[in-house]
Amino acid sequence: MLAFNPRYQGDRVLAVMAGLLGMVDAAFEHKADFYVLDDLDEQKLYNCARNIEIAVWKMSSTRTVSGQFQLVSNELDPNNPNLSFEREFGRVIGLLDFMAKIVADKHGRSITRLTQSIATSVFLPVGALGFK
């Protein structure tokens, strides 16, 4: 992801948000409106939720060579923690997982769950899964 590249000199927050927006848009088949008979791909929704988990973890832990956070996402004061950032992303992840489950149940399919170690996390494909 561009925002976590140490050589990137641009706006890291913009890069993260643009990446997340593009991924979520792809998970929803680039549609703004949905109708009762519209279909979504449960695997794209599931992968999108996992990618957001990975991005949140990277935002909370990636540091520069000098030891400073590349992106400050949480309150740094240990006496006054503010974890609203993680709560908001947790809510989005939960909604995506719930939608993936609903779509999978509707289609009578199961979601392919990949076992991953968070330390070696790679982003999962969302846009490249193709259209139905």
For each predicted feature, which ranges?
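Short, low-complexity, Pro/Ser/Thr/Gly-rich segments in the mature regions of secreted, periplasmic
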Residues: T112-K132
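Mature extracellular/secreted ectodomains of secretory-pathway proteins
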Residues: M1-I118
